[in-house]
Amino acid sequence: MAWSPQQDDALAAVAAWLRRRDTQVFRLFGYAGTGKTTLARHLAEGVDGDVIFGAFTGKAASVLRAKGCPGAATLHSLIYRARESEGESPTFVLNRESPAAKAALIVIDECSMVDEELGRDLLSFGTPVLVLGDPAQLPPVKGGGFFTDAEPDVMLTEVHRQARDNPIIRMSMAVREGESLPHGTYGESRIIGKRDIDAETVMRADQVLVGLNRTRRAYNNRIRNLMGFRDAMPAAGEKLVCLRNNKQKGLLNGGTWLVKEFATSRSKKKVVTMRVQSEEDARHVVKVSVPQEFFDGREER
């Protein structure tokens, strides 16, 4: 494959780091379409030993597999293991027998999502870690940033020609350069005015992203009302987003879960207890207890 001069320099820098072994982490950052994953896959082919590909979410791991990174999995599944407990749900502990302990290299995509606890657990294996990140990517609302709190060792800025044909990448380039995007259709994406957003448009969507918590609350209340929900507490089948890590239960900030069973609402303690199922792994079902204020709009008061 023909590499650009910038990509050639990146390959040489990572190869030199692998030879030196003077630091455990190498930060290869770049905008979308600059070829970070392609470079990492090429480097992995030349490593003497096993290379593990991982990402924070299952969706990101599936994208890695689609790009030719075999066995890519979530970081949680790579380094933690379930342990039987007396409760209804298993607990998760660091797996010292993880393949991460014997690998020659760990490659982590979308590293901005990794927080300090997960990052330190990853580094505890002593394995060299190549982290891939995009400085233009929005960071998580809470947590994350363990690997992005330092300057990149290599920063890729040249978007290759094939990527420029992708409408989403073209839009991201325009926004990054301060340009406004006119209303219209961009591949499978559409940009419309605020006045054009109606109930039918919203109800066809899988998710709605907004910029403010008060907007989120208003949209959630309206959508749930349109769906026939009258109680502020979650119902079976609804989707929830995890806001805080709980390693013992296998909960990660930003993960999405489906309510399987609403158990109890204890008014004295003002806690909601329910069973939830991971959207990424249907086998992962846990029992959680959450303060009621997270569902009735009082979490920030």
Language model regions located:
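Hydrophobic positions on the alpha1 helix immediately C-terminal to the Walker A/P-loop
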Residues: L39, L43
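Hydrophobic "anchor" residues on beta-strands that sit immediately upstream
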Residues: P70, L105-I106, L130
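Post-Walker A helix-loop "phosphate-sensing" segment adjacent to the P-loop in P-loop NTPases
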Residues: E45-F53
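Conserved acidic residues
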Residues: V51, A104, D206
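Conserved helicase motor core of P-loop NTPases
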Residues: W3-P5, A10-K36, R120-T127, L132-D296
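Catalytic P-loop NTPase motifs of RecA-like helicase/translocase cores
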Residues: I79, M113-E116, L138-P139
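Walker B catalytic acidic pair
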Residues: D109-E110, G133
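Inter-Walker segment of RecA-like/P-loop motor cores
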Residues: G54-K102
